[in-house]
């Protein structure tokens, strides 16, 4: 009984071992098939590059000219067109100057102070012709001169720098002086005595900027008295006037009156020191 059980047990073990071996063999076979399939897949070209070698062979393949079916005139025309398609030859010009000419040019530079160079015959190297062409001699313009008269004239045209020791009078501050003149007071140019004269307390530099600042200050002062300007003008005038215009002047650095080209926007009419309305006509 025990022997039969042992025999059955050994048979089952052998069966299991055989099945295990068969499964291992089957697994090995499947792995081999899978690897072979993957090799075949990777041997295929990617992204449509299968025709690269074929395209290269087509590009590098020389094109044969069909001359058997063409006549003699056709052959001549094809040869001329092929020659026309060739790139044009580039000519290189080599300019050479003999040593004797170089020595002569240096001697003329040392003696006369001018540079004169001549260009003789120079060979022109081309693609199909080996002939030479003669170049006409050219003379360069003088670049420098050592003539003492020209150097002295050049020095004389250079302005001298300003001397720093002298004081600059134009930048000295001066008082701002305003003056009002009527049109009858300036018939012949620069007036001498204004109708209204006022010297302000402000000091300005004696230059264009200072004059502009003084002019602005005078305008500010006049605007303050603008509503009563007619009474001020007639009382200061002392006699009758008819359609007079008032102009603003300021004094410059030389104590002279300068017209600012500024005038009142109205006309003044005075009778016995009293202003009245000027008529439109007459």
UniProtKB/Swiss-Prot annotation:
Signal peptide stretch: none
Effect of residue 164 to T: In strain: Usa8, Usa12, Usa16, Zim7, Zim10, Zim13, Zim15, Zim16, Zim18, Zim22, Zim39, Zim42, Z36 and Z50
Name the record gives this protein: Follicle cell protein 3C-1
Provenance organism: Drosophila melanogaster (Fruit fly)
Low complexity composition bias: residue spans: 106-118, 141-156
Source organism superkingdom: Eukaryota
Impact noted for substituting residue 135 to I: In strain: Zim15 and Z50
UniProt-annotated stretches for the region Disordered: 103-156
Impact after mutating residue 71 to I: In strain: Usa13
Effect of mutating residue 168 to A: In strain: Usa8, Usa12, Usa16, Zim18, Zim39 and Zim41
Biased composition regions of type Polar residues, renumbered to the chain: 128-140
Substitution effect: residue 108 to S: In strain: Zim10, Zim13, Zim16, Zim18, Zim39, Z36 and Z50
Expression tissues: Expressed in follicle cells during vitelline membrane formation.
